[in-house]
Amino acid sequence: MLSVPASSRIDFAGSPRPTVGVEWEFALVDAHTRDLSNEAATVIAEIGETPHVHKELLRNTVEVVTGICENTGEAMADLHDTLKVVRRIVRDRGMELFCAGTHPFANWSTQQLTDAPRYAELIKRTQWWGRQMLIWGVHVHVGISSAHKVMPIISSLLNQYPHLLALSASSPYWDGSDTGYASNRAMMFQQLPTAGLPFQFQSWPEFERFVHDQKKTGIIDHMNEIRWDIRPSPHLGTVEIRVFDGVSNIAELGSLVALTHCLVVDLDRRLDAGEQLPVMPPWHVQENKWRAARYGLDAEIILDADSNERLVTEDLDDLLTRLQPVARSLDCADELAGVAEIYRHGASYQRQRRVAEEHDGDLLAVVDALVAELEL
C-alpha cells in the first residue's frame, strides 16, 4: 500500500473511556395538516445558541444532540431535557415533532434548503438525488481509545448491520405510496456519492490513504463529506454508527443505543484480548443491508463467510444473551433487554402499516401515531 504524505496523516483524538453520544434528527410537522413545516430556522433562533440543537440540510429538520455521556441512561436523560424545551417552542408555533426514516406523504420538491455553503455545494454536485434526501436518522458515537482499533471494529460491526437496520426500520412510505420496503431511507441515502457501506479496511493507514485519494481527486474537500453508514470521527475519537432510520420514541431509542454501545465495546474488548475480529465478504454485507431494508424483521440474513443463514430475530435472541455481561458493565442491561420488545411487538415500519390498515390507508393517521409516540 502506498504511504501518504505527512500532511495527509489523520490524528485520531482517542477516548480514554467508551463514552457514548447520540444525534437524533426530527422533522417539524404542521399540527393540523401533518405535512412538513419549513420553520426550523425560526425554532432554532428562538432556542438560542446551544450545542444541543443543530440545523440540517432541509429547513424542516432540527437535530437534537447529547453531550459526552457515560452510558445510555445518561444519554437518554440528556435528550429528554433538550427535547422538552424544543417541543414547547415547536408546539407554541403550531407544529409537532415527528421522527421516522421518511414522512409518509410529504413531497420532496416543496422542501426548502438550509442556507449554508456546504449544503449548497452538496446540492450543486448531487442535483436531483441530493434534493431527494427527505430522510431522517439517528447517529450513535462510541468512544475508541486508539486509531489502530477503529477500522477492524467498523469492518466487524458490519456483521450486525442488518440487525440494527431491521430493528430501527421506519420508512415504508414515500410520497404517499407504500414502497414495499421496511427502510426506504437506507436505499435513498446510499445514492449520494461517498454514502453507503464503508470499505472494509483493516488498518488506519488504509483509511488515511483513502481520504488522501478522495481529496486529491476532488471527490471531497472535508472528511465529514465521507457519509458512510459507519464511519470514524477522528476529531471526537469515536466510531459513528449511522445505520438507523429515525426513531419515534425515547424508550426504543434507548434500547438501540444500548445495543450499539454494547456491540462496539464488545469488539473493542475482544481486540484487547488478542482476538482477530470476524468479518464477512463485502458481497454478503451488501446483500444483508438490502435484505434488512426490504424485509425488516422478516429478513433471513447471512451470518458469516461460510454463507450460513438465519432469521434476524432468531439471531438477535442469541446476540442479546451474549451481550448481557457487557451491558451490565456499561450499566445498560435494562435498556438492552428492551431490544426484544421491539421485535416482539413490532418495529416502527410494522406499526405504521398497521395504523394505515386500520384507517383505510389514511396516512394522516400514521403521522398522528408517530407524533403521539414521542412521550416526554
Curated annotation (Swiss-Prot):
A Gene Ontology BP annotation from the UniProt entry: modified amino acid biosynthetic process
Pfam families according to UniProt: GCS2 (PF04107)
Catalytic activity from the UniProt record: L-cysteine + L-glutamate + ATP = gamma-L-glutamyl-L-cysteine + ADP + phosphate + H(+)
Family annotation (InterPro entries): GCL_type2/YbdK_subfam (IPR050141), GCS2 (IPR006336), Gln_synth/guanido_kin_cat_dom (IPR014746), YbdK (IPR011793)
The UniProt record lists the keyword Amino-acid biosynthesis: no
SUPFAM superfamilies: Glutamine synthetase/guanido kinase
Molecular functions per Gene Ontology: ATP binding; glutamate-cysteine ligase activity
Domain of life according to the entry: Bacteria
Keywords: ATP-binding, Ligase, Nucleotide-binding
EC number of this enzyme: 6.3.2.2
HAMAP family: Glu_cys_ligase_2
Known function: ATP-dependent carboxylate-amine ligase which exhibits weak glutamate--cysteine ligase activity.
Family under the similarity heading: Belongs to the glutamate--cysteine ligase type 2 family. YbdK subfamily.
Protein name: Putative glutamate--cysteine ligase 2-1
Organism, as annotated: Mycobacterium sp. (strain KMS)
Taxonomy of the source species: Bacteria, Bacillati, Actinomycetota, Actinomycetes, Mycobacteriales
